Amino acid sequence: MTDLRRLTAIRGLRNNNPGNIRMSDTTWQGKISKEFNTDTNKAFEQFESLEYGLRALMKNA
């Protein structure tokens, strides 16, 4: 069984950004603006939901 506390430690899941897409000027759908981004070093995009993060990953591929 997976320990859910461990999953929150994974940056990509915490930011709803499984592709660990770096911060950019791209206007991704569902992107959280830099002022509201809670990533500690603000180097990675953050999305409203995992679905938006997966969408960005697929479009970025």
Feature map (PLM): residue ranges:
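Cell-wall polysaccharide-cleaving catalytic domain and substrate-binding groove, primarily
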Residues: 1-61
